[in-house]
């Protein structure tokens, strides 16, 4: 059934969604947004999905819709451009609801940066700059799982995709064909990264100071991090609710043998000791007994402070390219990419471009980076 508030159409059942998805798939683009709650959960809880085609706005109630198959097909339809803004969490909502992600993806925050506007520009600021409209902020933190939603919430949600469609048309008209292709390439990479669900057994590589642990201790850290990641997903609780991040390194280094030792670990929550203490003690003991053949390799040390001038010279290559192209410099070369490049051969070389430097960035700046390192 379609229930209409002023200029807003509600979709609250599977048949209506399927019917509307057929119509949406005839459109050249759709503006999409979500409202969700993520207070004490691992996954976002969807409260609303908004769709706009530039003329009308729809609100889909995810608390009532059960069959998301037609919407998943819409998201994957390559003929319809999906327009979102700063959409990493929206993508998580779509993946959780439908099992699919939007392609092709046009992120208006990225588009603004491609046009030389500020990097990581907030939605309200972008709407003000492009459309000269001041958006109300009253509803950004409201409860989107409550029913009924207030008139203010519904208006706010519908206005979001109405203005998003207008912003898209304004920005898209200013993008060169080349920049538009790069922007969609970035959107595709964002989607691909989310599709590659992170391996829980690789999470230990991100722990601060992990490089200071011996391989046997790293085996313990690996098992702790994998358990933490798996339990966060299983329990739908934040990782730090399962086991606080600051406890991981001392647990792997000190190898507590009983609950008293466990409770003495700095920042260890009493709830964790009470609920999971016995299991953690056994997990640590088992991981510490693993044969050497199952230990991870030592993690690489961080780059020394003396690479700072070299990093600056590499970053300058990206800044010069940004000036040439009229783009925000932050779009060019992420710090992680430059650090990976340096780690491939520092201090004496040879250096190798990391796989994370892809597409147009690799084509336009890859050789210049290698040349700069050769002459350093």
UniProtKB/Swiss-Prot annotation:
EC number: 3.1.13.5
Cofactor requirement: a divalent metal cation
Enzyme class, first EC level, given as a word: hydrolase
One Gene Ontology term from the biological process aspect of the record: tRNA 3'-end processing
HRDC domain mapped to chain residues: 214-294
A GO cellular-component term linked to this record: cytoplasm
Catalytic activities: Exonucleolytic cleavage that removes extra residues from the 3'-terminus of tRNA to produce 5'-mononucleotides
Domain of life, per lineage: Bacteria
GO MF annotation list: 3'-5' exonuclease activity; nucleic acid binding; nucleotide binding; ribonuclease D activity
Location within or outside the cell: Cytoplasm
Residue span, 3'-5' exonuclease domain: 8-176
Location, primary (coarse class): cytoplasm
Keyword Ribonucleoprotein included in the entry's annotation: no
Function: Exonuclease involved in the 3' processing of various precursor tRNAs. Initiates hydrolysis at the 3'-terminus of an RNA molecule and releases 5'-mononucleotides.
Protein name: Ribonuclease D
Organism: Pseudomonas paraeruginosa (strain DSM 24068 / PA7)
